């Protein structure tokens, strides 16, 4: 699996969870919450063998504009739906990072980060 295929696989698992939740397979410049945004975590790639890496993907669960009450409950629902779906699809998650502001399109959103991991191989690049 390549890194792009890993991102697409995670997005495909999350997309059908709720018709009201948008799913983005990569970074975007604006969102309408609630939304899942797949972006690379830090560290992104960890070497595990020759030409083989463990990729770490952050699924940002952006629940609502930065406002404690409605966003927090929505955020908990998103995480509660995403974790079993990822487990059922055999995509291991490492951790759920604490709630923190997430900026997109010059707006602040209440968000959590689900960190997933998968072995990947980098595609060959021809000059």
Report residues per predicted region:
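Broad, structure-driven detector of short, well-ordered beta-strand segments within folded domains
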Residues: 36-38
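Charged, amphipathic alpha-helical segments and their flanking helix caps
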Residues: 1-30, 40-127
């Amino acid at each position: 699996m390549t890194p792009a295929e890993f991102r697409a696989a995670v997005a495909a698992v999350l997309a059908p969870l709720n018709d009201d939740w948008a799913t983005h397979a990569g970074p975007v410049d604006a969102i309408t919450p609630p939304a899942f945004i797949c972006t690379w975590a830090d560290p992104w790639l960890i070497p595990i063998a020759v030409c083989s890496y463990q990729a770490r993907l952050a699924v940002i669960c952006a629940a609502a504009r930065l406002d404690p009450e409605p966003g927090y409950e929505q955020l908990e629902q998103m995480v509660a739906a995403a974790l079993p779906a990822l487990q059922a699809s055999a995509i291991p998650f490492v951790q759920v990072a604490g709630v923190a502001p997430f900026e997109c399109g010059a707006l602040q959103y209440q968000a959590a980060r689900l960190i997933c991991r998968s072995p990947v191989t980098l595609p060959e690049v021809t000059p």
